[in-house]
């Protein structure tokens, strides 16, 4: 549907049944994937939007993550956080499976880069603590050590050196248990 006036477009869109809207968004997403297969990166954000509106959780998650990655590479840190947060919100409506928990861990780790560049804006602590919780739930020692390291840095930056040190010590123990030198080395730097 093409309308020249935004108000007419909005009225026409809102007059469609929700089921029909979802179908249209899904078809638009598929058409973009087919037509622009060679240069999909240019359309990640649009695909995330259409697949979210179509309630295609798998594709919406995929394109929200890719949009966040793209924004991070382009130093658009606030945009990156918004896309990653969208992926987290989408996952929160999905079944509580191990795969979805792993996706939640992945997204929260990806969020840590823009959060660090933005000096940990409001809500950052909750993101990191949720990542720590998910890592403990599925027994993923590597991601747990990463979140403990991030929490150590967070509290150090926020002026709570004691709590930061506690997380650093716990991180080192976890990294030592996984025998991952890449996780042990950054702890001393922070």
Predicted regions and their residues:
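Amphipathic alpha-helical segments of tetratricopeptide repeats
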Residues: 30-34, 68-69, 86-96, 129-140, ...
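Short secondary-structure boundary elements
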Residues: 1-82, 86-94
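Surface-exposed alpha-helical interface segments used for non-catalytic interactions
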Residues: 65, 78, 82-85, 105, ...
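Alpha-solenoid helical repeat architecture
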Residues: 39-44, 75-79, 99-103, 138-150, ...
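Glycine/alanine-rich phosphate-binding loops at beta-alpha junctions
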Residues: 85, 89-97, 102-104, 109-116, ...
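Tandem amphipathic alpha-helical repeat scaffolds
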Residues: 11, 49, 67-73, 106-120, ...
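Short coil/turn connectors between adjacent alpha-helices in alpha-solenoid helical repeat scaffolds
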Residues: 13-20, 57-61, 69-81, 99, ...
């Amino acid at each position: 549907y093409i309308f020249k006036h935004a108000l007419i477009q909005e009225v026409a869109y809102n007059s469609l049944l929700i089921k029909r809207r979802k179908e249209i968004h899904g078809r638009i997403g598929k058409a973009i994937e087919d037509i622009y297969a060679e240069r999909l990166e240019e359309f990640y954000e649009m695909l995330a939007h259409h697949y979210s509106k179509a309630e295609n959780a798998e594709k919406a998650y995929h394109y929200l993550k890719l949009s966040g990655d793209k924004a991070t590479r382009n130093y658009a840190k606030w945009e990156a956080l918004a896309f990653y947060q969208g992926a987290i919100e989408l996952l929160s409506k999905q079944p509580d499976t191990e795969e979805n928990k792993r996706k939640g861990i992945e997204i929260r780790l990806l969020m840590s880069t823009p959060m660090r560049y933005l000096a940990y804006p409001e809500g950052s602590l909750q993101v990191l603590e949720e990542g720590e919780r998910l890592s403990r739930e599925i027994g993923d020692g590597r991601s747990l050590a990463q979140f403990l390291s991030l929490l150590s840095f967070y509290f150090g930056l926020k002026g709570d050196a004691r709590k930061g040190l506690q997380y650093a010590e716990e991180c080192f123990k976890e990294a030592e248990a996984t025998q991952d030198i890449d996780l042990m080395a950054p702890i001393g730097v922070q």
